[in-house]
Amino acid sequence: MRALPGLLEARARTPRLLLLQCLLAAARPSSADGSAPDSPFTSPPLREEIMANNFSLESHNISLTEHSSMPVEKNITLERPSNVNLTCQFTTSGDLNAVNVTWKKDGEQLENNYLVSATGSTLYTQYRFTIINSKQMGSYSCFFREEKEQRGTFNFKVPELHGKNKPLISYVGDSTVLTCKCQNCFPLNWTWYSSNGSVKVPVGVQMNKYVINGTYANETKLKITQLLEEDGESYWCRALFQLGESEEHIELVVLSYLVPLKPFLVIVAEVILLVATILLCEKYTQKKKKHSDEGKEFEQIEQLKSDDSNGIENNVPRHRKNESLGQ
């Protein structure tokens, strides 16, 4: 008779258990839908889970179809360690059971610790992990292989730096300031390098020539005083983050004060050459004209002499003829 209350209690709990099992079965993806096994996702190690409790969550999605002609890529910027949830969805008119799903990191295939599920004509795959160091940065790609392969890629990188795109021009003896910024990010440390080749040399802060200043955490400034022509080279600013480093270079061109005068001097030289050419041409023309006038004058004199001689010769016969008639 004492067993009755226990039996009644067990019978009372049975509907609740059945209801709970039904709910779990409904929420669990079935193999008939072409999904993965019951638990395709392997949880990260306990230590990483504990560390990840205080990390922010980064969730990103990529959508693909059987008609996608090009791989789809998405760039993601990370400054600090984070929990990451990547989801790819693939829509096809074919059989979802015939689609092979894989994940790769930088070309190397990942373990089967990702989730695959299907809804209607769409196949979903989800990869969850935690990025805690620079080795886990890189490219994560999901692949759907049917008749042809479709790929979606998530590119993880640290924030980019922004300097001056065009070369910075200054003059010998002046001072200049090089600036690097990181928008909406705060690096742990800044470093400046100079390079006129493939070798980068750290800028000596102890020298009076260089002054490094960082008024704000997201920017750094390098002041160079008493510029020389050999100071014209590439300068690199490097920002250190928890997940890696980022660099930006600024080109510095140092000119002497004679350089701006060169175009003016060239113009002056061209003007002088043009004026000299014009003067020589005029002098040559005048000289030629003078010779021409002298030649004409000489011809006129010769013509006059010729006319005079002809006149004298004509007068002599007439004089003789008159003498003969007089006799």
Curated annotation (Swiss-Prot):
It is found in: Cell membrane; Synapse. Residues 291-308 have a biased composition (Basic and acidic residues). Its main location: membrane. Keywords: Cell membrane, Disulfide bond, Glycoprotein, Immunoglobulin domain, Membrane, Phosphoprotein, Repeat, Signal, Synapse, Transmembrane, Transmembrane helix. Residues 287-327 are annotated as: Disordered. Disulfide bonds join 88-142, 180-237. It comes from Homo sapiens (Human). Residues 282-327 are cytoplasmic. GO terms for biological process: axon guidance; dendrite self-avoidance; homophilic cell adhesion via plasma membrane adhesion molecules; plasma membrane lactate transport. This is Embigin. Residues 1-32 form the signal peptide. The modification Phosphoserine is found at residue 309.
